[in-house]
Amino acid sequence: MSLFFLDNSRIKLYNKINNTIIEKLKQLDSDMALIDSTDDLYTCVIVGGSALVLMDKIFRSTHDIDSIASSEKIQPLLEAYNINMNVKAYLTNFPDDYRERLVPVEIETKKVKFYTVSTEDLVVSKLCASRDKDFEDIETKEVTENLNWKLMDRLIEDVCYGMLNEYDENHLRMRYEDYKERFM
């Protein structure tokens, strides 16, 4: 993590946001351990701004935690903790093989293993979403400096292949080419 260039107030805000997300995930895990005393383990895949915060890629406030995949048994707890599972509509913004690139969230848990999608998968999904805050998220040095551009090219092709109309496909390709030109 490169906090060197952040002023003290932004560092404090970042630490508070990161700690809030981590504490929520740890509490969810603790509650799941109370509900289920078996040896079963569960998973939750986090995406969006919260994933980028957990990966030390962005340093802004995010109001929600989004999950695109989770074990069915923990879904009532996710709902209780206001972890948004309604982003499954955006699952088409992720290549089919995104699970092959999952990154474990480095927190100690007993029952629930938390993951984020890869940085490349997050960039593709945010290029698909095409909102101003999404562009801001993926234009930080922490995101752009270590991207695997060959993988990015393939992921863009995979997502475009699954798009329903030519307009969305062309729009994504143009956004990606612009992004690539500015940050590669």
Regions inferred by a protein language model and the residue ranges of each:
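Compositionally biased terminal segments of proteins
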Residues: 1-184
